């Protein structure tokens, strides 16, 4: 993977990539646009550093609400058309105090059940690269406190 491909994978501007790498913008631009400039070892280290800094895993990195919203909208429309009525983000991500190891709490209204619901959960985890806590809205009838939290602090991300 090239420096340009790595930068675009993480949706970074050249200025942001240079800042993360602690190199002048002009130097970064030369490395990205001219393969004969500098050493291959430095270029590989720049790529590795960008991946280390920007990569999202279950225990590293934070997702934006916008990223969660866009990723799940695409998943629901492509893989589960007409099967997801709505989805709310709640918990630490919705309240704005998520940490790198925070899970993503989601409440969905869906007709999926059994292994199909488990498959939905796994698809979301795979796309977001984070642990998720997926609850079905219909299962919350006896949990008024959680319903109130979702209605008060939750962010509608689909439906």
Protein language model features and the residues they cover:
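Catalytic core of pol beta-like nucleotidyltransferases
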Residues: 1-83, 95-100, 110-159
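Short helix-loop-helix/strand-helix junction enriched in hydrophobic and basic residues
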Residues: 91-93
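Short beta-strand->loop micro-motif that forms the acidic, two-metal-ion catalytic signature
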Residues: 105-108
């Amino acid at each position: 993977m090239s420096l340009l491909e790595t930068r675009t994978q993480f949706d970074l501007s050249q200025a942001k990539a240079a800042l993360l790498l602690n190199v002048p913008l002009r130097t970064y631009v030369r490395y990205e646009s001219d393969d004969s400039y500098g050493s291959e070892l430095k270029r590989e280290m720049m790529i590795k550093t960008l991946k280390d800094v920007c990569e999202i895993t279950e225990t590293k990195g934070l997702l934006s609400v916008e990223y969660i919203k866009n990723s799940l909208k695409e998943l629901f429309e492509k893989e589960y058309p007409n099967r997801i009525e709505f989805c709310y983000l709640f918990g630490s991500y919705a309240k704005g105090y998520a940490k790198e190891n925070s899970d993503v709490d989601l409440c969905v209204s869906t007709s999926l059940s059994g292994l199909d619901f488990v498959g939905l959960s796994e698809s979301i985890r795979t796309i977001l690269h984070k642990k998720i806590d997926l609850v079905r809205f219909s299962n919350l009838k006896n949990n008024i406190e959680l319903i109130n939290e979702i209605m008060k602090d939750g962010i509608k991300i689909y439906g």
